Amino acid sequence: MSELTALTIAEARDKLKAKAITATELTDAYLSAIDAANDAINAYVAVTHDQARSMAKASDERIAKGEAGALEGIPLGVKDLFATKGVHTQACSHILDGFKPEYESTVTANLWADGAVMLGKLNMDEFAMGSSNETSYYGPVKNPWRAKGSNADLVPGGSSGGSAAAVAAHLCAGATATDTGGSIRQPAAFTGTVGIKPTYGRVSRWGTVAFASSLDQAGPIARDVRDAAILMKSMASLDLKDTTSVDLPVPDYEAALGRSVKGMKIGIPREYRVDGMPGEIEELWQKGIQYLKDAGAEIVDISLPHTKYALPAYYIVAPAEASSNLARYDGVRYGLRVPGKDIADMYEQTRAAGFGKEAKRRIMIGTYVLSAGYYDAYYLRAQKVRTLIKKDFEDVFAKGVDAILTPATPSAAFGLADEVLANDPVKMYLNDIFTVTVNMAGLPGIAVPAGLNGQGLPLGLQLIGRPFEEETLFQAAHVIEQAAGRFTPAKWW
């Protein structure tokens, strides 16, 4: 069965088309793999065995009739904050206990319309707040990768840790994820997978549990660049139910792969050389520069002067929006309800019991920066900084730069239950240092595996593109992937 789960989406698509395998066989292979591995990895918080099998059966019938969709019979995992009709959707928070939506998110509806099969819902940091997938009410996810000669558990990154771990461990062919400050790209880098955060407005947010509405964007995590391109084509669409959705045709992203990068201008930002960055990250970056240079790209030094303000500004804007978005969870209509002596007490008891520590921390920060006395000093200034960050990128792109190459993360995956990080949230927030600028500016960014560190753990590079020019990112990421190769963890689970 493992030879079926080893297939990429592109390979499985070809075999299904040629009738060499059936969607039912492929789905059963994944369900068996999940049943065998999930206790160890904890990537799934709900597995939809019956639904997966009936969707696979319907796919086989469509294939037989010659009516196959673009993702016909491909088994996918869904991050737990996409609404899936009648299926567990809790953003891995206790406050949404027992919640099963009456409707389907636009992203998942697009995937099912193209014939994809749902295997279940994937673990994540609570309300997508975290960089290690340790804030989930359902417990942490374990990274399928381990350091050479070590049995120590590592984090898969966050918030889309379940998505990245499931893809890396071959517990789904691909997965949906979301990215507010790096939640697709950082876990992809930590697990040797490919993750793209599309331009803000490219993929509908309708039916996705909101964290920070002006930053959130859904995208895929996949095993390679081609699979990410295939998934993104199905996920992206115009959606009138999302006022930020953009009316632009969705290109065939897969067609961009293999196109030459000769003459493409790649910017290298000097501000991304941060103090204390491990030598192996710098080395990897140089390697990526060389790969693109060898393929004919022109490398230019650039400056993004406001980079150093991105992280503090992000941790004002994102919690501010979160405190507003999370105000709706009160125990009245759905989810957890803890009885109280009156309605105000019921609200308090429900929210106290329902939200985890990190969600509470961000709600408090957000409420503080939006309060009358501090709104101008913090929130307003952070929004001004955001405008300056966006302008930095606009200036660089105006000079003819096609894409920007940076590291994806400041380190490889770190240990589960790391005491230093547990006691110092700011240190944990530094994981997003290379990724938040992309969300602040609403740009597309892709993380692609580019090598292993000295301990045999995957490291990723990030490419940042012009708005709605994801094709350029796929094109350049494919060049890096071809040069660096693909990386799969040794099975221990």
Swiss-Prot record:
One GO CC term, this protein: glutamyl-tRNA(Gln) amidotransferase complex
PROSITE patterns in the record: AMIDASES
EC number(s) reported in the record: 6.3.5.7
UniProt xrefs under Pfam families: Amidase
Enzyme class: ligase
GO biological process: translation
Purpose of the protein: Allows the formation of correctly charged Gln-tRNA(Gln) through the transamidation of misacylated Glu-tRNA(Gln) in organisms which lack glutaminyl-tRNA synthetase. The reaction takes place in the presence of glutamine and ATP through an activated gamma-phospho-Glu-tRNA(Gln).
Subunit and interaction comment: Heterotrimer of A, B and C subunits.
Protein name, entry field: Glutamyl-tRNA(Gln) amidotransferase subunit A
Gene that this polypeptide is encoded by: gatA
